[in-house]
C-alpha cells in the first residue's frame, strides 16, 4: 500500500484535486492492528487501491488521530475510513479483516464513488442518495461486532435525512442509490443545507456519544472502585486468614516444641533418677564394703588394744609404783615389785626420811586405811597397792585427823573449824570422866607435836625462797596494772622510761 507521507490536510487536498477517495487507517499496537496492517500491505490490496485512493496511516497515540477523532469518532482500533468528496464516509471497516475481503470492500467503495460522481454530474443532489448504499452496506457488514454497530448508528443519520428530503420533494429512494427528480434550481442549494444539517447532527451525535462515554466512564470507574474495594476486602480477608493460619501454625509449633521439651525433660529426669539409683546402689555396696572393712579394722584394733592392755596390765601387775606423802606436804616416789611385802616399802621410807618422824606407820587416805603389823607382811598386790598407790606417813602418836589437816589444805581447815567446838566439848567430857593419860603417851604426843612444828617450820623456811623466786620471776614476766597482770613486751621498758604528756603524746 502506498501511504501518503504528509499531514491530513495535505492528503485531503490531494484527494480533492484528483477526485479520489480519502482513506484513513487508524492503527494501534495490538495484534488486530498488526493483522490489518498486513492486509493493507498485501499486493492484491495495493493493486486494487492504486488508482482513485489517497491513503494515510495514523497512530492512535498521535495528535493527528486526536484531531481526526473529533470529527469522525474512532470507536474501535483498528479502523479504516473511506471518505468521499463531500466528507461523508463511504465505508468504515472496524477491526481486522482478510486481504480478499478488503479487496472486495475497496471495489464496492470504488463503485459507490463512481456512481456518486455520475449522479453529481447529472444532478447536484445525487451525492445524498449515494450515501445510503454505503451506509446500508456498512450496517450489513458490521452486525457481528459491537464497535462496528456503533459506527452504523452514526452513519444512519445522514441516510435518514436524505430519505426525508427526497420524500418531501416528491422523489423516490432505492436500496442502493437514490436519484433525485427535483428541478435543477433546488438541487444547487440542497447540498449546502444538507451538509450543514448533517454537520449539526453529527456534532450533536458526537456530544451525545461523548456524554455516553462520560457516563460509561463514570459507571466504569464506579465498577472499578467497587471491584477495587471488593478486591481490597478480599485481600484483607486473605491476609487475615494468612495471619490466623500463621498464628495457628506458630502456636502449634510452640506447643509441639513445648511438648518436645517436656518429653526431653522427662527423659532427663528419668535418666537422672536411674543414675542416682545406680550411684546409690554402688554407694551402698561401697559403703557396705567400707563399713565391713572399718568393722574389721576396728575389731583388729580392739584386739590389738586388748593385747596391749593385757600386756600393760601384766607389766603393771609386776611393778607397784608407791608415792609416799610426808606430813609436811612433800612426797617422793619409788617402784617395788608387786609381790614385795609392805614392810619393804616401809623400810625404804624409813631410810629416806631417817629419824625425822621417828617411829611412823603407813596409811591410805582413799579409802581411809591405816596398815597394821599384820599388813606389813602382805604383798603389795594383795593390799591393792599395785600398780600404783599413794601412802601417807603417820608419825607415832599423831592422830590421822591432824595429818589430814596438815596435808589436805583449806578444805580440812574449814572442816576443823566447824568441828572444833564439838572436839572441845568432847575433850572436856573425856578429861572429866577419865583419868589423865599415861606419861609415855603424853611425851609421845609432845614429841610428835614438836616434830610436826619443826617440820612445818623447816618446810615453811624451804618454801620462802621458792616463793620469792616465783614472785621475782613473775615480776619479770608480767606487768601489773591495778589488779590486772599482762605479759611484758620489748617496748614496755621503753614506754616506762619515756615521758608522756596529758594528751598521750610523748615529750621530745
Curated annotation (Swiss-Prot):
Domain UBX, residue spans: 315-393
UniProt keywords, alphabetically: Endoplasmic reticulum, Membrane, Nucleus, Phosphoprotein, Unfolded protein response
SUPFAM superfamilies in the cross-refs: Thioredoxin-like, Ubiquitin-like
Annotated intramembrane regions: 414-434
Cellular localisation: Endoplasmic reticulum membrane; Nucleus envelope
PROSITE patterns found in the cross-reference section: UBX
Subunit organization: Directly interacts with VCP. Interacts with UBQLN1. Forms a complex with VCP and UBQLN1.
Designated name of the protein: UBX domain-containing protein 4
Annotated organism of origin: Bos taurus
Amino acid at each position: 500500500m502506498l501511504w501518503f507521507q504528509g499531514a491530513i490536510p495535505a492528503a485531503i487536498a490531494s484527494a480533492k484535486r484528483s477526485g479520489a477517495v480519502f482513506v484513513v487507517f487508524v492503527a494501534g499496537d495490538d495484534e488486530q492492528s498488526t493483522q490489518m496492517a498486513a492486509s493493507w500491505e498485501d499486493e492484491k490490496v495495493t493493486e486494487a487501491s492504486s488508482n482513485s485512493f489517497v491513503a494515510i496511516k495514523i497512530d492512535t497515540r498521535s495528535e493527528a488521530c486526536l484531531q481526526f477523532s473529533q470529527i469522525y469518532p474512532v470507536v474501535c482500533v483498528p479502523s479504516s475510513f473511506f471518505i468521499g468528496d463531500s466528507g461523508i464516509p463511504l465505508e468504515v471497516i472496524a477491526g481486522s479483516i482478510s486481504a480478499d475481503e478488503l479487496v472486495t470492500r475497496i471495489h464496492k467503495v470504488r463503485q459507490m464513488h463512481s456512481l456518486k460522481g455520475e449522479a453529481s454530474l447529472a444532478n447536484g443532489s445525487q451525492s445524498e442518495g449515494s450515501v445510503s448504499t454505503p451506509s446500508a452496506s456498512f450496517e450489513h457488514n458490521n452486525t457481528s461486532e459491537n464497535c462496528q454497530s456503533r459506527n452504523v448508528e452514526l452513519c444512519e443519520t445522514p441516510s435518514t435525512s436524505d430519505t426525508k428530503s427526497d420524500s418531501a420533494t416528491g422523489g423516490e429512494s432505492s436500496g442502493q442509490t437514490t436519484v433525485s427528480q427535483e428541478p435543477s434550481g433546488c438541487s444547487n442549494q440542497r447540498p449546502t443545507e444538507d451538509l450543514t444539517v448533517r454537520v449539526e447532527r453529527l456534532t450533536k451525535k458526537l456530544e451525545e456519544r461523548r456524554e455516553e462515554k462520560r457516563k460509561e466512564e463514570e459507571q466504569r470507574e464506579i465498577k472499578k472502585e467497587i471491584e477495587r474495594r471488593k478486591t481490597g476486602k478480599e485481600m484483607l480477608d486473605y491476609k487475615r486468614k494468612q495471619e490466623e493460619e500463621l498464628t495457628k501454625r506458630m502456636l502449634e509449633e510452640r506447643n509441639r516444641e513445648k511438648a518436645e521439651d517436656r518429653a526431653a525433660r522427662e527423659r532427663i529426669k528419668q535418666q537422672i533418677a536411674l543414675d542416682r539409683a545406680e550411684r546409690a546402689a554402688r554407694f551402698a555396696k561401697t559403703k557396705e564394703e567400707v563399713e565391713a572393712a572399718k568393722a574389721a579394722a576396728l575389731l583388729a584394733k580392739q584386739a590389738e588394744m586388748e593385747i596391749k592392755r593385757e600386756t600393760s596390765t601384766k607389766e603393771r601387775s609386776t611393778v607397784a609404783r608407791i608415792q609416799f606423802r610426808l606430813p609436811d606436804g612433800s612426797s617422793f616416789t619409788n617402784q617395788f615389785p608387786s609381790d614385795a611385802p609392805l614392810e619393804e616399802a616401809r623400810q625404804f621410807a624409813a631410810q629416806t626420811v631417817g629419824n625425822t618422824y621417828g617411829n611412823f606407820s603407813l596409811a591410805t587416805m582413799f579409802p581411809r586405811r591405816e596398815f597394821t603389823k599384820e599388813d606389813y607382811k602382805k604383798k603389795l598386790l594383795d593390799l591393792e597397792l599395785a600398780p600404783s598407790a599413794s601412802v601417807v606417813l603417820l608419825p607415832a602418836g599423831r592422830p590421822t585427823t591432824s595429818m589430814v589437816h596438815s596435808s589436805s589444805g583449806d578444805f580440812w581447815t574449814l572442816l576443823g573449824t566447824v568441828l572444833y567446838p564439838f572436839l572441845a566439848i568432847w575433850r572436856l567430857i573425856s578429861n572429866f570422866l577419865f583419868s589423865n593419860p599415861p606419861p609415855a603417851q603424853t611425851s609421845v604426843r609432845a614429841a610428835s607435836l614438836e616434830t610436826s612444828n619443826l617440820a612445818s617450820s623447816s618446810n615453811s623456811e624451804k618454801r620462802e625462797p621458792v616463793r620469792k623466786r616465783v614472785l621475782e620471776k613473775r615480776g619479770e614476766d608480767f606487768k601489773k596494772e591495778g589488779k590486772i597482770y599482762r605479759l611484758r613486751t620489748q617496748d614496755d621498758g621503753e614506754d616506762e622510761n619515756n615521758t608522756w604528756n596529758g594528751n598521750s603524746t610523748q615529750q621530745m
